[in-house]
C-alpha cells in the first residue's frame, strides 16, 4: 500500500517536476541533466578526495538496503531541521560531489573558491568521488548519522527515505526566492517542503557514431523499434558491433527496459504504476519481452554482462574507441567519451557524433513526445550551517549556472539557458523541447530497494536468465504492489 506521503511524492515527481521541465523547454529556456542514483550499503565511509579523479562521473543504480519507508509519518520523531541565519563566525561546509573528471572538477573548485572569497568566514571542504563510490559512502555515512552538509542527490525515493529519517533539512523558507527559476525542484520536494535544489536536468537518447552508421549504409537510429532491430542486423552484417552497454553496472541496461515501459505503457500507465506499485501489467511484461528480443540478436560488445559504464573496456570506453555504433545514454555521454580519449570536449572526438531519440514502439500506448530522464541536485544535511544553504543558492544562480554549463550543459536555472552552445547538448535540448511528459529514471524515482530490483531484473533479462513475467513479479513484490 502507498502511504499518503509517498503518493503525493510520486505524483509530484511524475507531473510537477516533469511538466516544469517541459514548460521550460517549450519556453526556450531549458536545462540538462545527468542522472545517477541512490546508494549502496556496505562500503567504507569516503575519504576526502583530491579534486582530480580518474573515472568519469556517471549515472548509476540505487542500492538494495533496508525495506522501503512505509510509515504514515516520518520514521523519526523529530521534525526535519531548518536552516538558521548565518552567524558570521568561522564555519566549514562539508561538500560531496561526483564531478570527478576535468574540466568539471576544476570548475567546481573554482565555484567554491569564488564563494569563499565572497564569504571570508566560510571554508568549503570538498570530497570528490566517482559515482558508485559516492553512493556506497553516502549510505554508510547516513547509517552512522554522519551526514555531509551538502551532497549530491537525484531526489526521488532515496531522498524521501532520508527525509523520513530526519537526515536532511527543510530549506523551503530559505530558497523560495530562487526555486521558481529552476526546473526539476519537484524532485526534491515532498508535502510542500523542499530539501534540495537541482542544478541540471536532462534526458536519455541514442548517441551514435555517424561514421560507423555510414559504413553500414545507414543515416541515423531508426524512429521505430522494429526499424532499430533491422538496423542492428544491418550493422552486424557490416562487421560493426551495433550497441555498447555496461550491463555489469546494471543501471545503463535499465535505460532500455525502462524506456520500453514508457513507450508501451505511456504516460498514463507510468503514473498508474507509480500509484499502485504494480508492475505486473501487460505493457511491462511486453517491455521485458522486447529486451529479450534485442538480446537474442547478440547486438552488444563482447563481455557486456560484466562491463561497467566508465571503464576503458566498458560502455563509454567502447563507444569512445569506436567499438560500437550506438549507445543509449544520458546527455553526459559525450563528455565521458571525450574523457576516455583524454580530450576536454566531445567536439574534438576523432569521429562524428550524433544524437537521436528513443524509437516509437508499434502498438504501445506511449508516443514520441514522452521521454525518460532525470535531475541532479544537492541536498542539505541535517546539521549543515546556514551558509551551506547560501552556497547551494549560489550554485544555482544564473551566473554560476552559465559558468558550469561550459562543461555540464543544460543548467536547471532557466535564466542560464542561453549558455547552452555545445552542439551535442543542443541536440538533447531540442529533444527536451518536444516533450509533453518526462519519466524520471526508475531506479531513482522509486525507493532504493525498488530501484535496485528494477536494475537487478534488468541485468537478468540482459543475461537471458529470467522471464518478463518473473521480472515484473519480482519488482512488484519488492514495491509492495
Predicted regions and their residues:
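C-terminal capping/gating helix-and-loop segments adjacent to ligand/active sites or protein-protein/ligand interfaces
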Residues: 407-418, 426-480
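Glycine-centered hinge/linker elements that transmit conformational signals in sensory
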Residues: 232, 275-306, 358
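A structural signal for short loop-to-beta-strand junctions that line the ligand-binding cleft
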Residues: 141, 148-149, 177-212, 241-244, ...
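Extracytoplasmic/periplasmic solute-binding protein
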Residues: 81, 191, 195-197, 204, ...
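Hinge/lid segment of periplasmic solute-binding proteins
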Residues: 154-204, 223, 229, 256, ...
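Short, solvent-exposed loop/beta-turn-alpha elements that line the ligand-binding surface or hinge
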Residues: 169-182, 247, 264-286, 341-348, ...
